[in-house]
């Protein structure tokens, strides 16, 4: 809750109760730009974003690019673009700045060096000098900067001194956690190349950026005791930690490429709506009351991080598609049209120029049969293109039948004589045709369906023909008859 603009919480840490006050909820998402945005990272960003927005706080984006070999600005831009597509905006970050920047770790090296040297001054860290020929071999340690050895080319790092005792904290999901310091050795906080290690950089950054809560994957749980030791060495108050169970594959191991696609970029390209992806990711671990199909904005005020499950959840690709299909049929037709056009441009798909009303009507009937924008494009293709191809199954199972030509000729004649072009009259015409004994109803309907679309699976046949219109339907029947005569 907020009292005079401050966020308070009370934690029980073992036998002690600690009351902490934060001027403002400040959370961060800090990806490493070494690849595309993983759906697990997107879910972590979502939970942080929802907490900040509900509590009137700030959501900070920080780029952790200290892995100089794997990090790239290209991946950074892709991550930012994926976050924007997900509908997640930030209040401070590398692209918009803020009061606590820079927001790229590679631009904060001098800050880390100064704080590491402060720990050396306080005897909580020390320099380590290594052999020039064998950089893995430690020569000696010292509290004085080894200028002479550094100038001679010896690698020099700074190590943090682990003190005896225990380190504990209260995790919002996992409860009281305690670690025996004897299980940890002194660890490097500044590498020989002048870059900080992960555990040191995040502590300095989170403190200086006034981060109040750290919500992250439980794969970071083992890092927490080291980070808490650094907080203690500086005399800083640690943020509230919450370690979220990982998203799992079907074999209950952490979701990875061996299970299938894992990047936000992939699902975007495949035609998943951003609102559907966020809906599904929210369902992965968050206990939501009511309808499971929703937009994040609809559920924002009911979000409580304590409602997140402490168990791992399996990523179900089919469930994601199902959720997406529900959203495609739920949203306003004009919104779907806009999203479809934007997706086609992103995926490199060409949409032919057609009448606006015809396009909308096609979209209306086709969205009922599919679950992704990619599938929507495929099913709409013959509506948008007169040079569609005939599916092999249509040709082999129906068009090569002896009665095919006569059925199509009769259909062409019946539609030509039809004065009122509406679904009721079209249905009556086709049912009358199927009762003439030319072929079974299924064969008649599938012959005509394939003739006007090239496909055996389409929206309802009567709707399809109504939307195609009389002129287009007659032309397509004639086109198929000409194709039949050539085969």
UniProtKB/Swiss-Prot annotation:
Localization per record: Cytoplasm
Alphabetical GO biological process terms: glutamyl-tRNA aminoacylation
Any coiled-coil regions, as ranges: none
Binding site for ATP: 257
Xref: Pfam families: Anticodon_2 (PF19269), tRNA-synt_1c (PF00749)
Short sequence motif named 'KMSKS' region, residue ranges: 254-258
Gene3D superfamilies from the UniProt entry: 1.10.10.350, Glutamate-tRNA synthetase, class I, anticodon-binding domain 1, Glutamyl-trna Synthetase, Domain 2, Glutamyl-tRNA Synthetase, Domain 3, HUPs
Motif ('HIGH' region): 31-41
Single GO molecular function: tRNA binding
HAMAP family reported in the protein's UniProt record: Glu_tRNA_synth_type1
Protein name stated in the entry: Glutamate--tRNA ligase 2
Organism for this UniProt entry: Thermotoga maritima (strain ATCC 43589 / DSM 3109 / JCM 10099 / NBRC 100826 / MSB8)
